[in-house]
Regions:
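Residue-level signature for tetratricopeptide repeat
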Residues: 62, 66-69
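Extracellular S/T/G-rich loop segment that most often corresponds to the catalytic His/Ser-adjacent loop
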Residues: 442, 448, 456-533, 537
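Subtilisin-like serine protease catalytic core
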Residues: 220-371, 386, 468-470, 480-482, ...
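Hydrolase catalytic cores
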Residues: 130-164, 353, 499-563
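Helix-turn-helix repeat elements of alpha-solenoid scaffolds
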Residues: 27-43
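N-terminal domain-start motif of subtilase-like serine proteases
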Residues: 105-116, 203-237, 242-251, 318-328, ...
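Subtilisin-like peptidase catalytic core
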Residues: 19-26, 68, 115, 119, ...
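Substrate-binding/access-modulating region of protease and related hydrolase catalytic domains
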Residues: 322, 356-462, 510-515, 519-521
């Protein structure tokens, strides 16, 4: 049985031309790639004992794309049925295959755009909005942001570069990406206006009805009054940087590690560098993206659509890097705001990592891995020196990072060798992090599970996939207590908290709502810090147990209940 992603086969495909060529190549050439990928994936499903639902969804989703591209419409219903069977969340289960069914019927019946618009409104409108609403809004957002020039730019500036480095011997998933891009270009893009209009009609109908899920999260919260007898508590924010002007800090405010593992005491808030003058515009685009995902037609969302629609191929790379840099700039401050909300006794320690935002990956080496490992050990040692009680880790890593970088730089003899090398190098980092955390038994570490709707332990994420007595891994629920469609899950994900449209600070003091397990884990950090502040004599294990024992079971979700956890410790609120 396949028990981890590392056990899945790695394959390469020899291209005749650069990936961007296939965006406009004769269809027969793309069809040949589709046949190769389809044969390999089907062989895996037939011969390997794969039980991980997320992996099966990835396989079946690719096979569905290949069938649609090839015009094998008779295969679509069966693949959709298999895909739905692997969906264990109500939202994705409801929406899976609806669009594929419409496109299949449109092609088989040679229907026009008006028919497509009507069918989209009819079929998506028939779904339970409580389950399907977020998926419908997300699909509409993705369609509205489709820009073939942007896709062309990504191919030319990223995939082509990787293919040149590898002498056109590329990972099989690049071949699948080529087919998927042609499918979108040929089948979806011509119907974009009709598809968006149909989905907009569904969104508008439910907006008019003002259907909202009940909020069970907010009543569970509690704040500590400044006048209450409590003690200061050190809270580590191990993240991309924090604007410490917004928070009270520990005596030593923090430590910084660059992307290569080197430590400094500067740049606790990540510098924007040359992008600094454009911060107001970048902030608007991030806000616009969140509004766009929520199907809100705000000035910020309209500005985002205008910018994306106007992108030329040569601007794709710079736009992606701008968005990546901006996300890193805001992330840590937003997380910190959640972690210390309602706790005047919290003192923030910024454990800043200056992760790279460029599209080109680092060049892997054992020296790099050992520097990062040493950086992890030094960072945890600084937590002990500052006597922190709880540290939030809203980030994750895996061997896939190394495997991608090795592939990009064409290191290793073949795909399987790169997998081996990646695991070897990543183990240096993973083991150092695990051992350092285990060596700080009085500190409670809180990790975000991930946002890929997959299994943290199957993917072997760190820190989310680790099992340590002083670690809690957190999944994301919405305010109604339902698991979000994006949240990573698995046996190491032991508690859930609100990670949906959580409002917190940006650098400079403005506020914004963001989604993710990155927003869920600091909710648990927040609870732990409050418990430590109110009863400083509590041990790490007492606080961890109170958090877990206070959570309410809701299916596979165990939703944190801060008030109940406090009551279990005899804390009167």
């Amino acid at each position: 049985m396949i028990t981890s992603s590392d056990q899945l086969p790695r394959r390469s495909v020899k291209l005749d031309k650069l990936p961007s060529y296939y965006l406009s190549a004769p269809r027969a050439e793309v069809q040949a790639l589709a046949e190769v990928v389809q044969k390999n994936l089907q062989s895996d499903l037939d011969t390997l004992d794969i039980r991980d639902a997320a992996t099966l969804r990835e396989y079946l989703g690719t096979l569905l794309n290949l069938a649609q591209f090839k015009g094998d419409w008779s295969a679509v219903p069966g693949l959709v049925a298999q895909l739905k069977a692997q969906q264990d969340k109500p939202g994705p289960r409801a929406t899976t295959g609806v669009m594929a069914g419409i496109l299949a019927d449109q092609q088989l019946g040679d229907r026009d755009a008006a028919w497509v618009r009507a069918e989209v409104e009819k079929r998506f409108g028939a779904l339970d909005w409580t389950d399907a609403g977020e998926g419908i809004k997300s699909t509409k957002s993705q369609l509205e942001l489709m820009n073939p020039q942007f896709v062309k730019g990504v191919f030319e500036q990223q995939l082509d570069v990787a293919a040149r480095n590898a002498n056109l011997v590329v990972p099989e998933d690049i071949a699948a990406t080529i087919v998927g891009a042609r499918l979108q270009q040929e089948l979806v893009l011509p119907l974009k206006t009709a598809l968006v209009a149909g989905l907009q009609a569904v969104v508008d109908r439910h907006a008019a009805q003002a259907t909202a899920k009940p909020d069970v999260w907010t009543p569970r919260q509690f704040a500590i009054a400044p006048t209450v007898k409590a003690s200061e508590v050190g809270v580590g924010i191990w993240d991309s940087g924090v604007d410490l002007k917004l928070f009270k800090t520990t005596a030593v405010p923090g430590l910084t590690m660059d992307a290569d593992g080197r430590l400094t005491t500067g740049d606790l808030l990540r510098p924007l560098g040359e992008a600094a003058p454009r911060w107001p515009e970048l902030q608007q685009l991030i806000k616009g993206y969140m509004d766009q995902r929520a199907a809100l037609d705000t000035p910020d969302a309209r500005r985002l659509r205008e910018v994306v629609a106007g992108l030329k191929a040569e601007q794709a790379k710079s736009f992606q890097e701008d968005m990546s840099l901006t996300t890193l700039y805001v992330h840590g401050t937003h997380v910190a705001g959640i972690a210390v909300a309602g706790n005047p006794f919290a003192r923030v320690y910024a454990a800043t990592v200056l992760w790279d935002y460029k599209t080109e990956p680092f060049k892997p080496s054992e020296e790099h891995a050992r520097r990062v490992a040493a950086g992890y050990r030094a960072m945890v040692e600084s937590f002990k020196q500052q006597k922190l009680r709880v540290v939030n880790m809203s980030w994750r890593d895996s061997a896939a990072k190394y495997e991608y970088a090795l592939t990009w730089h064409n290191m290793g003899t073949d795909a399987e060798d790169r997998k081996r090398l990646a695991r070897q190098l990543f183990a240096i980092e993973r083991d150092a992090l695990r051992d350092a955390m285990a060596g700080a038994p009085d500190i409670l570490f809180v990790a975000g599970a991930g946002n890929e709707d997959n299994s943290a332990d199957f993917e072997e994420y760190v820190p989310a996939g680790l099992q340590l007595p002083n670690l809690i891994t957190v999944g994301a629920a919405d305010t109604a207590g339902d698991e979000t469609s994006f949240s990573t899950f698995g046996k190491t994900v032991v508690v859930y908290a609100n990670g949906f449209e959580v409002e917190s600070y940006l650098p400079g003091g403005d506020k914004m709502k963001l989604n993710g397990t990155s927003m869920a884990s600091p909710q648990i950090t927040n609870l732990a810090a409050k418990l430590f502040a109110l009863q400083p004599g509590l041990t790490m294990l007492q606080v961890k147990n109170a958090i877990l024992d206070g959570a309410d079971a809701r299916g596979r979700v165990r939703l944190a209940n801060p008030r109940k956890s406090a009551e279990l410790l005899g804390i009167a609120l």
